[in-house]
């Protein structure tokens, strides 16, 4: 018996109707909170190298990255290139009421959307600008240092001088024992971030595309002295 189709309606007894019903039920069970939005797709098409990925981070990646942060107590956290804010929302959800989250976003559309998302949260500060402004933004808010700095920006496309300058500012902005956490398609930054005393990486497959998650750690005690190093000579504990 042929299926009766009229105005795109499918007869309830048709096998096609049963199939679409199953698909609808399966779709309803999927968490779409981390899927690509229209805004994300448009910005990727306009700035593919800046956005770096065609889809936002998966829920699994977001949770894995957040697991690298100790949320017990007030924390100061900065994020470079939050995009749609999938990591930002998870961090804000977990951090205490006395914590601060500074979001540095170059893209005006993303920045405006982040301000809308966190309009009622005084802990979250959205900065439309370069991550290199971190020292000034901390000083402006009378914050001494960050406990954690998170980044998903594609460091591989930055010129070497800009890359090293941002790494130096990141290192200086961290408290002793603080961590710089990155998630990247490649792990090339590890060979440049020799200013950090310790680094550990993992290859995370539950994301499209798979990502390297690397945690760079600043030494717990440095006797209060600034540490500028010869980039090509500084040792780093490289654990895969």
Residue positions per predicted region:
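S-adenosyl-L-methionine
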Residues: 111-140
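Conserved beta-strand signature within the Rossmann-like core of class I S-adenosyl-L-methionine
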Residues: 177-184
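A short glycine-rich, Lys/Arg-flanked "PGG" loop and its adjoining helix->strand segment in the class I
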Residues: 164-176
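Core SAM-dependent methyltransferase catalytic element
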Residues: 203-240
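Conserved class I S-adenosyl-L-methionine
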Residues: 74-83
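Glycine-rich SAM-binding Motif I of class I
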Residues: 85-89
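Class I SAM-dependent methyltransferase Rossmann-like catalytic core
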Residues: 39-69
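Conserved SAM/SAH-binding beta-strand->alpha-helix loop
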Residues: 107
């Amino acid at each position: 018996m042929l299926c009766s189709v009229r105005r795109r309606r499918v007869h309830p007894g048709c096998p096609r109707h049963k199939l679409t019903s199953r698909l609808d039920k399966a779709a309803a069970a999927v968490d779409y909170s981390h899927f690509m939005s229209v805004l994300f797709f448009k910005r990727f098409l306009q700035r593919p190298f800046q956005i770096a990925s065609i889809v936002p981070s998966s829920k699994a990646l977001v949770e894995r990255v957040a697991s690298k942060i100790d949320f017990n107590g007030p924390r100061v956290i900065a994020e470079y290139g939050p995009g749609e804010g999938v990591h930002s929302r998870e961090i804000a959800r977990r951090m205490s009421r006395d914590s601060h989250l500074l979001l540095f976003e170059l893209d005006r559309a993303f920045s405006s959307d982040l301000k809308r998302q966190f309009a009622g949260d005084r802990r979250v500060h959205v900065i439309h600008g370069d991550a290199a402004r971190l020292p000034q933004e901390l000083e402006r808010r009378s914050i001494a240092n960050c406990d954690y700095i998170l980044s998903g920006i594609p460091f591989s496309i930055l010129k070497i001088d800009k890359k090293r300058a941002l790494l130096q500012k990141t290192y200086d902005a961290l408290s002793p024992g603080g961590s710089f956490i990155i998630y990247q398609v490649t792990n090339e930054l590890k060979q440049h971030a020799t200013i950090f005393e310790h680094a550990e990486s993992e290859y995370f497959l539950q994301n499209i595309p798979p990502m390297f998650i690397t945690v760079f750690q600043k030494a717990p005690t440095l006797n209060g002295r600034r540490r500028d190093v010869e980039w090509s000579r500084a040792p780093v504990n490289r654990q895969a």
